[in-house]
A protein has these predicted regions:
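Short, Lys/Arg-rich N-terminal segment immediately upstream of the first membrane anchor
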Residues: 1-7, 220-226, 269-280
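Interfacial/capping segments of alpha-helical transmembrane domains
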Residues: 33-37, 299-315
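Perimembrane loop-to-helix junctions flanking transmembrane segments
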Residues: 40-45, 310-324
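Short linear interaction motifs
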Residues: 51, 62-66, 265-275, 315-321
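Membrane-interfacial, low-structure loops and terminal tails that flank and connect transmembrane helices
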Residues: 255-280, 356-360
Length: 364
């Protein structure tokens, strides 16, 4: 063990530093988390919804699959859109259309480029400005109307409106994804908050709470210099780290004085199987069964990209919606991998123990 003392201390040092960094960044994540307004009110002071409504909306969104169906802030599945980015763009374009009708009597697409530029400037000023004061977020009358119209789209999308059936198929959403109208309303409030976070600048900074994500030219949501710098640094550190490991393996490790000779016979075949090793057959059968289950689920999940609700004409989403199959597909992989590692450990234990089963090994 003495020969490896330096390596042990190196490992302990690396783990100590990395866990300190992990703890510090974990604290920063909570400290820098975007605020949830205690109240969202209209320009005349009427309460539109509260923090509890936003959190209840998050629960409603999670109940239909959460990150398995679409995404929030880019962290989920992209069979359906990123709801925060989609909501933001729809709300912005709705605001522009409302403003164009109010001020010029035409749709935004029909007014001149100069008029469009004026409206986009006002749009950016209204959306990027942090308007939370003492936990209260105030919406202008125009923005309130844009939010209501955007929410109406999501209410029909997650319901059973026949006009949205093709869109639901494109997104691999079952009919009546969220049946309760009250829950759909709560969910739209959560979606609004996620888009508000993506559009609103942090106090004292010129970047939003999501560091200008998603890309949205209408309000100049573009990658910051900090984004680009750390992206480049991350790639450089990754390549440099891999290069250092290769160099260390080639030049720093101790070379064997003589090349080891491969045995004429596999050493494992010279050791008779113990009772516990023979009983591992059920584990291996379970691994194969779970692996096959995962493969078939993967095929069915992938097929949702072709037919958003059906499987060769069979209404699969009615019984096994996309979010459920995708969840089972991922979970079955975890189960067969974990079972395989467990079986390997149980098989190797008697070999390490000199060809004898550890006490009570077969019982386990």
């Amino acid at each position: 063990m003495g020969n490896y003392r330096k390596l042990w201390w190196t490992l302990i040092g690396v783990l100590g530093v990395t866990f300190c960094l992990l703890g510090w960044f974990g604290r920063e994540v909570y400290r820098e988390a975007p605020p949830i307004p205690a109240q969202v009110v209209s320009a005349d002071g009427a309460v539109l919804f509260t923090e509890k409504d936003i959190l209840d909306g998050q629960t409603a969104w999670q109940s239909v699959g959460g990150m398995q169906l679409g995404s929030i802030w880019g962290h989920g599945a992209y069979q359906a859109p990123d709801w925060s980015a989609d909501w933001l763009h729809r709300e912005l374009t709705t605001w522009l259309d409302l403003a164009a009708q109010d001020e010029f009597g035409q749709a935004y697409a029909e007014i001149s480029e100069e008029q469009q530029a004026v409206l986009r400037h006002r749009l950016k000023n209204e959306y990027r400005q942090n308007q939370v004061r003492d936990g209260v977020l105030v919406l202008s009358a125009r923005r309130q109307m844009a939010v209501q119209q955007t929410a109406a789209y999501y209410d029909t999308l997650f319901g059973s409106d026949p006009a949205m059936q093709q869109t639901r198929k494109n997104f691999a959403m079952k009919e009546d994804t969220l049946p309760d109208a009250g829950r759909r309303e709560q969910m739209t409030r959560f979606f609004f908050w996620t888009s508000w976070v993506a559009a609103t600048e942090r106090p004292g900074q010129d970047a939003t709470y999501t560091n200008n994500w998603p890309h949205e030219p209408l309000i100049d949501n573009q990658p910051t210099g900090e984004n680009l710098m750390w992206s480049v640094i991350s790639v450089i550190l990754l390549v440099a780290g891999i290069g250092f490991l290769v160099w260390a393996w080639a030049f720093l490790r101790k070379q064997d004085e003589e090349e080891p000779v491969a045995p004429a016979r596999d050493p494992l075949t010279t050791i008779p199987l113990t009772p516990s090793q023979r009983s591992l057959g059920k584990y291996l059968f379970l691994v194969v069964a779970l692996f096959g289950f995962q493969v078939f689920l993967g095929g069915a999940t992938a097929h949702y990209t072709v037919e958003g609700q059906d499987f060769y004409g069979f209404p699969l989403s009615r019984w096994f919606p996309y979010t459920l199959l995708r969840t089972w597909h991922l979970q079955s992989a975890l189960f067969w991998i974990a079972t395989g590692f467990l079986a390997a450990g149980l098989f190797l234990a008697p070999i390490i123990n000199g060809g004898k089963d550890p006490k009570l090994q077969k019982v386990g």
